[in-house]
Amino acid sequence: MSKNNYINEDTYQTLQEVSIETQSDYEKAREPLWKQNTNEFEKYQIFVGTPVHSDESIHYTQALIEFQKECFQKKLKVSFHLIKSSLVTQGRNLCVAGFLESKATHLLFIDSDIYFQGKSIFTMLKANKDIISVPYPLKTLMWDKAFKKMQEGKIKSPDDIRRSLHTYPMKVPDANNIKLNKGVMEVTDSPTGCMLIKREVIEKMIEKYPDKQIVQKTVINGQYVNKPNMWNFFDTLHDPKEKTYNGEDFAFCKLWRDLGGKCHAYITDAIVHVGEHQYQGKFYDELISSK
């Protein structure tokens, strides 16, 4: 049989582009999801936390739907927690509070403007790191950087141009000595938009940073309520000595490193940071450049 779409009659799942060569392949494609694959991830439970200012992108929603299907297939328990907050710092702390009220083994931050691959999360789980993230490009295009590489003769294809336009919000212990193990490397700071955190990390921070507890009523999804398990682990950080300002993601990594912990990044899977791009131009330039 050739490649086609088949409907799994038990789960109403569309199996797209499944390569069917033999009768056994056909039966496997029809097999209900709960009978497929392995129990490798059964011991884990993921709490997906998303702080939202107003809405989320369709790309984020598509990624979550696909991830939920993959978790179901791998028998991995997953729950989703979207919290509305005008402050991303407060939103992340509220996600932590919700995570602590759950029985999940891992907190997975996925921001509402991120499109990720489920396989990246499963790889990070298997890496077994305390804090591990998938770094994503900033919402800016580095044209000067790309032009410099072009002058140096390092641009050989359109893909080279695309890759040269990006910069990533991440710091490493030693830029001259980067060690990569199965796509995983140690970092000092990385973004929180796609970050997996072990429960033990939060529990140790509660023990070591008791002064960061928050006890006050908070507006949650329009309701003014008491929220237990609130801790200020995500907050901006100003360094008066270095005269630098860091976001809540780098500040969180520093809290963990100050306790002797390490942070890591998984860098070999593609990820999308969804943002607006303004396509500015005038047709006159097209006429001039074509001469």
Regions found by a protein language model. Give the residues of each.
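C-terminal catalytic/acceptor-binding lobe
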Residues: S2-P32, T38-K43, E207-K291
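Active-site acidic short loop of glycosyltransferases
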Residues: K43, S102-T105, K129
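Active-site nucleotide-sugar/metal-binding loop of Leloir-type enzymes
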Residues: N93-H106
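Conserved catalytic core of nucleotide-sugar-dependent glycosyltransferases
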Residues: V96, Q117-D235
